[in-house]
């Protein structure tokens, strides 16, 4: 058996601590980087983190965003108790294109753009083919200062595309997402309906 003297033991403990701190820092840095790529509302210090995985062409997701999100914002986000994190989980090409537009646009308008995409979902998602749907989407975001040229550039932005697709793959592996919207509160998938009553009950247990 190899016996360690006191100095060796101290050195080993210090080395382990340094490695642990380095790994923790890398994990923290990755978390910050990932959040920069997401659309986030609310304080980073909030006790409750609510992840919303959704597809921009999903009617249930639109209903959740229009009817439930404002209630969560008013009761928990504005008070600093909760943070909302919107994560794209596109289920079709039209949703993927809308996600690309969302994430390659200026951070300052992303929330407004997300609201508009959901509010006008019934208008822009109807079309004979993807080109018509893209043109519909261009029309409904025009008054937010988004040009046709900017839209076209977003569609061919491989960096943005890869981030969205990799995020979708990672989310599916981590949370086994089978439908949208899927709500994850403090890293636990919400069971049951994604309605305000159910979410409120979960939040109240955590604050």
Regions found by a protein language model. Name each.
Residues 2-92, 96, 138, 142, ...:
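Extracytoplasmic thiol/disulfide redox context detector
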Residues 90-179, 184-197, 201-207:
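Cysteine-centric redox/oxidoreductase cores and disulfide-bonded domains
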